[in-house]
């Protein structure tokens, strides 16, 4: 059985390679803007993950595939912080996160094309940022690390210096909660 990761993320690819040696990457064309946040963080990220997995399933001609979709988002005071559109939005995101706790949710959807079965779940991690002054934020943004990252920071990179505390799965904040994924795949009978 072929394992397929429905993601363009190099971070997810690196993390998945810790669990599975041989897998294929197929980038999803799912329109993330088609999913509207309706107040439930876990539902939102699971719908996004499922949309990505379904899109890739439709592209595959090989029927014996298991497709993994994942999406990660940052939530602060009930609002979604996705990937910043530009440097100004990234600045405002980091300014809002400064000195505050926020939640990082990842949704995972695994689709078995043989059994026509989908399993979905989510992981929540709480992250507390230190106070960050404007100069520090601007210096960070010059590094370009904020691009393509929910909440405009990467905990695994320089953005990790902003993190004062973390409660929950570190890999969830990076973008692929390994423990949850391992348990989901094992529960579907995938030998890891």
UniProtKB/Swiss-Prot annotation:
Q: Which GO terms describe its cellular component?
A: cytoplasm
Q: Which reaction does it catalyse?
A: dTTP + H2O = dTMP + diphosphate + H(+); UTP + H2O = UMP + diphosphate + H(+)
Q: Which InterPro entries match?
A: ITPase-like_fam, Maf-like
What is the E.C. number? 3.6.1.9
State the superkingdom.
Bacteria
Residues at the active site: 71
The subcellular localization recorded is: Cytoplasm
Q: Does the keyword Aminoacyl-tRNA synthetase apply?
A: no
Query: What's any GO biological process attached to this entry?
Result: nucleotide metabolic process
GO molecular function per UniProt: dTTP diphosphatase activity; UTP diphosphatase activity
Per the entry, which co-factors are needed? Answer: a divalent metal cation
Top-level enzyme category: hydrolase
What's in the keyword line of the UniProt record? Cytoplasm, Hydrolase, Nucleotide metabolism
Q: Where is this site: Important for substrate specificity?
A: 11, 72, 156
Instruction: Name the job this protein performs.
Output: Nucleoside triphosphate pyrophosphatase that hydrolyzes dTTP and UTP. May have a dual role in cell division arrest and in preventing the incorporation of modified nucleotides into cellular nucleic acids.
Family classification: Belongs to the Maf family. YhdE subfamily.
Q: What is this protein called?
A: dTTP/UTP pyrophosphatase
